[in-house]
C-alpha cells in the first residue's frame, strides 16, 4: 500500500484517500443541492493547499483552488464534471505533498 498524500471529503461524510480522476468524478456526480453540496480535496497533514467543488443554486459548480505556498487563489465555475475532474487532477499533480519523495534527476 502506498503512502497517503491527500484525501477527498464530501459533506455527507464520504471519504476517498488519494482519489483518482474517476473517484473525483463519482464524488462530484453525487453532489446535490440539499445535504451533499460540496467536496473538499486537501492533504491530511498540514494542508497548505486545497480544492473544493460546490453545487451552485443556479446550476453548475463553483471550483475553488487555493495554494498558500504559491500565493494562489482561484475561483471559477463550470458545468461539465468531466472538465472539472480533469482540471483538478492536473492541478493536484503539481501540488507539494508533505512526506512525498522528491523527484531527483540524475545524469548517466
Go through each PLM region and give its residues.
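Acidic, proline/glycine-rich low-complexity IDRs
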Residues: 1-108
Amino acid at each position: 500500500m502506498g503512502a497517503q498524500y491527500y484525501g477527498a471529503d464530501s459533506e455527507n461524510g464520504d471519504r476517498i484517500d488519494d482519489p483518482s480522476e474517476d473517484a473525483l468524478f463519482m464524488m462530484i456526480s453525487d453532489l446535490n443541492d440539499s445535504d451533499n453540496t460540496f467536496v473538499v480535496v486537501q492533504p491530511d497533514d498540514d494542508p497548505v493547499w486545497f480544492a473544493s467543488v460546490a453545487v451552485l443554486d443556479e446550476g453548475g459548480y463553483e471550483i475553488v483552488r487555493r495554494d498558500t505556498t504559491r500565493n494562489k487563489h482561484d475561483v471559477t465555475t463550470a458545468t461539465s464534471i468531466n472538465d472539472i475532474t480533469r482540471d483538478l487532477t492536473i492541478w493536484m499533480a503539481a501540488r507539494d505533498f508533505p512526506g512525498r519523495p522528491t523527484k531527483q534527476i540524475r545524469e548517466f
